[in-house]
Amino acid sequence: MEIVKNNSIEEIKIREVLEDYWEGIRTKDADRAMSHFTSDLVEFLLAPPLIYGGKNKMDKKGTEDWFNSFEGNIGYDVHDLKIAASESIAWYYSLIHLSGVQKPQKTDLWFRFTAGLMKINGEWKIAHQHESVPFYMDGSNKAATDLKPE
């Protein structure tokens, strides 16, 4: 499988899909964001449970409930985006800065994000997403939600 990088046509198409997906999150438009998913999407999100997929997939109502937990738009800034793509499969990783007022407090969180995409009927769709934060390895089992990129 040949991996294509450096603003290839496929990478440009993928970036367009991702930008529209992220804008759906920022503007709290569940239909727009979810239109970029495969029908069998599997997600490892920050929120429980351990896995979303199959009969336990995140639905439109769950997405809207999360969106509506924010007052106003959601800050969803993507940093250090890296994409690798073949003609039909791609993956990307980045850091995400999530911010806003999530009732009743401010949210200011950096987390890691990795996703896999598949080209289906000529369109790039998100097939898998994985969000994570590191944990302090001091025995506290506390998530390191205070970290910021250097």
Which residues make up each language-model segment?
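Short aromatic-enriched loop/helix-cap "lid" or pocket-rim segments at secondary-structure transitions
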Residues: 46-48, 138-142
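A solvent-exposed, acidic/Ser-Thr-rich amphipathic alpha-helical stretch
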Residues: 12, 30-87
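A short, structured loop/turn motif at beta-sheet edges
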Residues: 83-90, 105, 117-125
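Short, well-ordered beta-strand segments in beta-rich or mixed alpha/beta enzyme
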Residues: 21, 33, 42-46, 90-100, ...
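Short, cysteine-centered beta-strand-loop-beta hairpins and adjacent loop/turn segments enriched
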Residues: 99-108
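Short beta-strand edge/turn micro-motifs at domain boundaries
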Residues: 110-140
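Short, low-complexity N-terminal intrinsically disordered segments enriched in polar/charged residues
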Residues: 1-40, 144-150
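Hydrophobic/aromatic beta-strand elements that line small-molecule binding cavities or substrate pockets
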Residues: 63, 78-83, 96-98, 112-118, ...
